[in-house]
Regions:
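An alpha-helical repeat/solenoid feature that recognizes helix-turn-helix modules
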Residues: 1-27, 35-125, 139-169
Length: 170
């Protein structure tokens, strides 16, 4: 699902830049994301998979919202699930989630496009989580001790309110 969602993101950017983008390609990508969705707001990595990861919720929202489908029926459950988790879980619980920084990045995009009622409480908790995850040298690491990708994702989340990146747009 992450590959499909990111391809949809690139196709949207290409279309906005004036490139010709096949409506069929977008439709097939959206259909795949829809197949990965579960009724409770979670998304599976593959539509035939059993396990749904919390980190994929934001990605599912962005995949649908990037196609101008902010009113898509799958978005409210996914958005509420992310908001609920960030309200309910402690900072330590959030840090222990599988793919915590990755999930935080995609959740940040989803919460940002959802408006301040979702964005502000999410961002406050995300900043606390990321502050505790940051190493003394400034890096962020994932479960496999990779640092480049998680550091880049964490920094994008932290700078979001500054409005420098077009990926954070409403």
């Amino acid at each position: 699902m992450s590959v499909t969602a990111n391809v949809l993101w690139v196709l949207r950017a290409a279309k906005k830049s004036g490139f010709t983008v096949s409506a069929d390609s977008i439709s097939k990508g959206v259909q795949y994301v829809e197949k990965c969705a579960m009724p409770d707001g979670r998304f599976r990595y593959r539509y035939w998979g059993l396990q749904a990861e919390p980190s994929l919720g934001g990605l599912g929202i962005i995949a649908l919202a990037n196609q101008g489908k902010l009113d898509h029926p799958l978005i409210p459950a996914a958005r509420e699930r992310i908001a609920y988790q960030y309200r309910r879980l402690t900072i330590d619980d959030l840090k222990k989630q599988r793919y915590a920084v990755y999930g935080c990045f995609y959740a940040s995009l989803a919460m940002y496009v959802s408006g301040d009622d979702y964005w502000v409480p999410f961002y406050k908790k995300a900043v606390q989580m990321l502050a505790e995850m940051q190493r003394k040298d400034g890096e962020f690491a994932d479960e496999a001790d990779n640092t480049i990708y998680p550091t880049a994702m964490a920094l994008m989340v932290l700078q979001a309110p500054l409005g420098y990146l077009p990926i954070y747009e409403r």
